Amino acid sequence: MKLASYHCVEFGDNVRVGWDAIIMDTDFHRMKNRETGTFTKGYAPVLIGRNCWIGCRCTILKGTKLPAYCTLAAGTTIGKKIDGEGYKIISNTSELKIVKENYYRELGNDAIVYPVDSINNR
């Protein structure tokens, strides 16, 4: 497992993680909206409930929240909150979709500013 935590990654009890999984609470950069000039935050907590099973080669991105007793199928990429009770098996579909428009990475002005107390106040 590869873990990149600059803000908050929390695991419930008895979580199992398969080999070559990646868990990140950061994008390592921000994105700029070309219309408004505003930037994305670039980080968000990752919360994994108890008794979850993360299959091999899964990628868990910022903003992911898994309720208890969820299984991520091998190779799944997730970056969102799963609502409701757990006991779900989650897998990606083969459908490709555009998730945001009018954003780009502005090189040289894409550093993330993390809250100073984000590590100490979990």
Where do the language-model regions lie?
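Short, catalytically relevant binding-site loops at active-site mouths
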Residues: C8-V9, R30
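Extracellular beta-strand scaffolds
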Residues: V9-E10, I23
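A contiguous pocket-lining binding segment that forms or flanks enzyme active sites
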Residues: F11, V17
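Glycine-rich hexapeptide-repeat left-handed beta-helix
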Residues: G18-R122
